C-alpha cells in the first residue's frame, strides 16, 4: 500500500481507485478502524517527499551577508496555499460521512471515468497558458483551485486530478499547476492525518506493535515512491499533456466496474 500511495497520490489517477482494488486483491488482516486510519496517515510519508524536494522554495528564510532574511515571495506563496486550504477546512467535517456512504466501487469508478473524460475536454479546448510561474498565481486563482480541491472529498476523484483540472481551466501552465498542487497537499494531508489519528485514539482504538511497524514501513515506502513520482510528473508535464492520465483513469474506472460486477456475482 505504501508503493501504491507513493505513486498514485501525486499522479492525477486517484489513490482511492487503486486502494479499493488493492484491498480486494489482498485481504488485510487488520481492523476496519486501523485500515481507515492507515489509508490516510500513510500520506505523511508522501508529504515529506514534497518538503524534501522543494525545501528551497518552501522555506521562507535565507541568509545574506551572515544575516537571516525573510523571503517575501515564499511568504506570499504560503498565504495563497492557506487561502486555497480554507474551503477544504470548511467541508472537512463531511469527510467521514462521505467515506461511509460513497467509498464503493460504483462511486470510485464513476469519478475515475468522469475526470478522465474531463482531462480530454480541458486539454482539447485549452488555450495558451497565461500563468507560468507560481508568483503569478493570484489569491482568486488559489481560492478557486481550493474549491476544486474540495471535490476530492468524493472517493475516486483524486485531489491532484481535481486541482490540476481547475488550474488548467484558470490558465495555469501544466508545470505550474502541478507544483502548486504539491504544495496544497502539505496542510491538507497533514491535517487529515492528524485528524484520523485523533479519531482513532478517541474512539478507544489502540495500535498493536505490529500495526505500528506496518504504519511506519508504509510511510517510509510512500516517501521513497513519492520522490520518484513527483520527479517523474514534473519532467513529464514539460513535454506532454494530461491526456495519457485521462485515458488511464477511464480504463481503470472500467476495471473497477468489472471487479464490482464479478464481486456482486460471486
Pin down the residues of each PLM region.
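Multi-pass membrane proteins that catalyze or facilitate reactions on polyprenyl-/lipid-phosphate substrates
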Residues: 1-266
